[in-house]
Amino acid sequence: MDNRNLSDVQPGDVFVYPANSNRYGHAVMVADVAQDPNTGVKAIMLVEGFMPARSIHVMRNWQDPFISPWFILDEGADDLTFSLFQFDVTDLKCFPPQ
């Protein structure tokens, strides 16, 4: 997978939490992106699945239930917390173009 800048996020992009020696990795896929036409602020809707990876669900925004299932992107942040995982902004990946 290729790296993607947070400012260029698109549906189908994936936040990849790398596995280490004592923990499984995790992935969260971007299902949709919305942008406020006045401010340019972006919000993303995410989906994830757990083990076994055979069903996925839209993630709930526990930190801001008023806008759930959307997550507001802070493009100046170094990391983002979704669900149980904290992702670095460099963890955003995309599939290479065909």
List each language-model region with its residue ranges.
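Short beta-strand-centered aromatic/proline hotspots
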Residues: 25-35
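Short, solvent-exposed loop/turn segments that connect beta-strands within catalytic domains
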Residues: 36-42
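Structural motif
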Residues: 7-19
